[in-house]
């Protein structure tokens, strides 16, 4: 019984001594081993602005600041207990201190990883700080237009009879050209364009007739009708009414040039219908040929299969002469 108690006390004493021994070793390691702390700080700044990288170092500590370019590090600041020594990176402008550095005039190339190392008494206590700097691109500047030119076009004014025109008729040549050009065949268009003159179509006004010379003075609200016979004449305003002129001068109908249009063999609508009809006929022929081809392709394998089946079932039949 006594031996059991003594052995138990010895075991407890040994275990306590082991715990104290391990604690002492950890305490000794903690006192003589440098303490290293690492963290990452994310910082961003605008392009062209300034950014400050702040550390938790005190003013009586020495610090080294680095800029990492891939796997290479470049010393950009060395602050030794109140004495700042700056070694700027290429194109890098900054102010250096123990607890912070400020980078001026940020560019997109300044983005990257930076590091700060603080130490006292020859590296006895070291602290590492990592900075991930992101430079945001400068937004594009938009400028408003200060000088804006407004173009005002006046409409022509038509009063009185055919030969009297007042007001600014700057749009008249262009309107005549558009009205006469919309519903014409290519051959007729080429004829009129070769003359270099504007078109004056026959108007739907009941006061005008096909045999009457029309000098082109009409209102913008009237609709033009280009339907005419081969015997009808079109009258242009002569060479003075160019399409590129900004103003129009009223011309005496006696000075007008008469242009006889070329005869039209088929209306445009009928020609278009014939082309469509021919197009559909070709499609119908192609469809019939495809259907016949598909039927032949579907029946051919069936015939081959039937012939093979008959040969397999009955074999070949030979005609023999039994007479001697």
From Swiss-Prot:
Modification note: Highly glycosylated.
GO cellular component: host cell plasma membrane; membrane
Region (Immunoglobulin V-like domain) residue spans: 36-138
Induction info: Expressed at late times of infection.
InterPro entries registered for this protein in UniProt: Ig-like_dom_sf, Ig-like_fold
Domain of life: Viruses
Membrane topology: Single-pass membrane protein
GO terms for biological process, alphabetical: symbiont-mediated suppression of host pro-inflammatory cytokine signaling
Segments crossing the lipid bilayer: 278-298
Primary site of residence: host cell
Signal peptide segment: none
Subcellular location: Host cell membrane
Keywords: Glycoprotein, Host cell membrane, Host membrane, Membrane, Transmembrane, Transmembrane helix
Assigned protein family: Belongs to the RL11 family.
Protein role: Plays a role in the inhibition of pro-inflammatory cytokine production. This effect is mediated by the conserved Ig-like domain.
Protein name as it appears in the record: Membrane protein UL8
Gene: UL8
């Amino acid at each position: 019984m006594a031996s059991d108690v003594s052995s138990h006390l010895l075991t407890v004493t040994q275990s306590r001594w082991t715990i104290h021994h391990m604690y002492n070793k950890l305490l000794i390691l903690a006192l003589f081993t440098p303490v290293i702390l690492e963290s990452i700080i994310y910082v961003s700044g605008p392009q062209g602005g300034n950014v400050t990288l702040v550390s938790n170092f005190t003013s009586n500590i020495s610090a080294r600041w680095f800029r990492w370019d891939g796997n290479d590090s470049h010393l950009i600041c060395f602050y030794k207990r109140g004495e700042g020594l700056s070694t700027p990176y290429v194109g890098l402008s900054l102010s250096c201190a123990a607890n912070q550095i400020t980078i001026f005039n940020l560019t997109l190339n300044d983005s990257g990883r930076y590091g700060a190392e603080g130490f006292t008494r020859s590296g006895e206590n070291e602290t590492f700080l990592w900075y991930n700097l992101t430079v945001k691109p400068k937004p594009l500047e938009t400028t408003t237009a200060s000088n804006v030119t407004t173009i005002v076009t006046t409409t022509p004014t038509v009063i009185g009879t055919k030969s009297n025109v007042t007001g600014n008729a700057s749009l008249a040549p262009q309107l005549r050209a558009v009205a006469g050009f919309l519903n014409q065949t290519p051959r007729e268009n080429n004829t009129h364009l070769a003359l270099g003159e504007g078109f004056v179509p026959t108007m739907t006004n009941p006061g005008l007739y096909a045999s009457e010379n029309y000098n082109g003075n009409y209102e913008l609200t009237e609709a033009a009708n280009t339907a005419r016979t081969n015997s009808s004449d079109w009258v242009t305003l002569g060479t003075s009414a160019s399409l590129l002129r900004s103003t129009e001068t009223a011309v005496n109908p006696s000075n007008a040039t008469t242009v006889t249009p070329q005869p039209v063999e088929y209306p445009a609508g009928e020609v278009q219908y014939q082309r469509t009809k021919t197009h559909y006929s070709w499609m119908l022929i192609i469809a019939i040929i495809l259907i016949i081809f598909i039927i032949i392709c579907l029946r051919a394998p069936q015939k081959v299969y039937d012939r093979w089946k008959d040969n397999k079932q009955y074999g070949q039949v030979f005609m023999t002469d039994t007479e001697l």
